[in-house]
C-alpha cells in the first residue's frame, strides 16, 4: 500500500524524490532525491537549509500508489500549528549513518504528525496486511499515541477497532508488556494491544 522513507530507496523501480523540505524563512522547498546507491542525497538538504530552519513537509510514497504523507489536518484532536494542523518535524534533527553516508530520519515530537486521508488500496476491515518500520529505540514517550500504519481516513476517532497501526512507547492506559518498556503495541483505536487482549502481556 505504501513505502515511506527519508533515508533510502525502498523499491528499485521507484525513481522519484524521497521527501520534501521547506524553509521556514521564505517558504521555498526542495525535493530530496536518492544518490546512485539509493541513499538520500543529504548534501542537497544541507546546502538548501544552510543557516536556516527546514521542516519535512512531504514523505513521498515509493509504492507507486501516490499515498504520500503530508502535514496532518485537524481531526478529533487539534494540532498546535496554524489552522489546528499538526506541526512538521525539523528536517535535520535525526541524522543517521547508512553504510558511511549521512542521511536524515524523521524526529517526531508531541504535536507533530503526517497523514494521508485519501490513501489507495488500504486494507479494509479484517483484510490481511503487514507493517514494517525502523525506529530509534531510544526515542519514545508515555503519551498516546506514537503510531505508524493504517489509521482512519478522516483524522477522527471513529470507533473501536477501526485502525491497524503500530505503537512504540511506555503508555499503560490499556495494557503493557513485560518490564518497564518501551513496548511495541498494536493501536487499533480505543486500545493498545500487547497481545490478544488489551492487558498485561508478560511474555
Q: What is each of the regions a protein language model found here?
A:
Residues 1-83, 125-128, 132-134:
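GGW-centered surface loops in extracellular recognition modules
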Residues 56, 64-202:
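Extracellular glycan-recognition modules
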